[in-house]
Amino acid sequence: MQLAGKRALVMGLGVHGGGTGVARFLALQGADVTVTDLRGPDDLRASLDALAGLPIRFVLGEHRDDDFRRAEIVVRNPAVPPNSRYLQIARAAGATIEMEMTIFFRLCPGPILGVTGTKGKTTTTLLLGAMLREQFPDTVIAGNLRISALEQLPTITATTPVVLELSSFALEGLGEAGLSPKIACITTIAPDHLDRHGTMEAYILAKEQIWRHQRPGDAVALNADSPIIRAMAVVEQRPDDVVWFASAAHPALAHAGRAAFWQGDELVWRDHRGGRHVICTRDDVQLRGTHNLGNIAAATAAACSFGVAPDHIRRAVQTFPGVEHRLELVRELDGVRYVNDTAATAPEAAIAALRTFDDPIVLIAGGADKQLPFDDLAREIAGRVKAVVLVDGTATPKLQRALRLVDPSVDVCGPFDDFERAVIAARHIAAPGDIVLLSPGCASFGMFRNEFHRGEAFRRIVESFT
């Protein structure tokens, strides 16, 4: 892929550095780089500082049609929809449309393992990376983790495993380019990002791109617990390439080939000959929540498909501490535990968090709308939660209506347009033995830059309590 001397336009720098890695990479490859973003320099200060000193032209606060007409390569941020009118201008002028991930896939010399899913993909990606690093210490972990894959390229050889977290947005671009990883893994699928994809069918199709362009002999690890995933065409088209995983001995596994599943307290790997190998037990697991048993099985299925030895997998499970912003214990104060699960940006993820705890929960929920239903989350709240503190946002009225329909007696406080006041209100409601759980079930846009900004604010507020 020739980049030197090419007129390259990066569309969308991003407030948390989403485009800095590809902009830096293109500049260092000798491309004539322009970065364009609708946000102004004040909003993008951290990203601009990260690119200081590089020969990059910036067009901020607007997109200019002429920039798209003159570009030979346009690299779109995953947040930019593929049907953007600016991309249509670029295509009409003969430009190639890329994403950071498509460039990386074309240039990466090592084998790629990709993980996607509505929930569980970050934990599974990092755990899979830890499993591989036990056997292959040079393993690279990147993707949808605020870690630029392109910046890791100089360290990657033909034998370096690369583990990538792949969002549905990134997979759209990979699908257009006809690219899939050697080992693919789909953790779960439930409604999410329907504000972007429009329909559940379109969202599923985006997720399916992770396996649709694989080569013969590649593998795809699929969740037997999910009816949506079990119905995917790859199951009939390439049965020998499918590796199953499940949080229990699911009936769908009875006649399947390779599989990783929990049987009682043991995680079992069944190889292609039908041999049974105990990988670990529940006593080896540090992660909270039954949903994380599924994540461990998913990572195990992918790791075993790549040839990682059971002992290496066991060591990774025993030492894996979890992921920040996901069921993260911030502190315990006056007998109350404060748990940061800000990464739960969809109702399904918040439901999984609520099912993790047996103690009374004061839930902090609400936020920006992704066109998702809240009926199931409302039922879970009514059955499990001591009180819910609502944060203002475009989705919050939908959650309020769902709660009123399910159980008008649910103790609801708010909504608050000040996040600190919401956290303080939750503290006042909680009693010794309770859990204050930030698991919003919604996106964060409007009040915060992103969900991680929201989680950091929660940490800061809780750590300030005396």
Curated annotation (Swiss-Prot):
Cell wall formation. Catalyzes the addition of glutamate to the nucleotide precursor UDP-N-acetylmuramoyl-L-alanine (UMA). GO terms for biological process: cell division; cell wall organization; peptidoglycan biosynthetic process; regulation of cell shape. NCBIfam families: murD. It holds the Pfam family MurD-like_N. Coiled coil: none annotated. One of its GO terms (molecular function) is ATP binding. It catalyses: UDP-N-acetyl-alpha-D-muramoyl-L-alanine + D-glutamate + ATP = UDP-N-acetyl-alpha-D-muramoyl-L-alanyl-D-glutamate + ADP + phosphate + H(+). It is found in: Cytoplasm. It comes from the Bacteria. Pathway: Cell wall biogenesis; peptidoglycan biosynthesis. GO terms for cellular component: cytoplasm. This is UDP-N-acetylmuramoylalanine--D-glutamate ligase. Keywords: ATP-binding, Cell cycle, Cell division, Cell shape, Cell wall biogenesis/degradation, Cytoplasm, Ligase, Nucleotide-binding, Peptidoglycan synthesis. ATP binds at G117, T118, K119, G120, K121, T122, T123. Belongs to the MurCDEF family. Its EC number is 6.3.2.9.
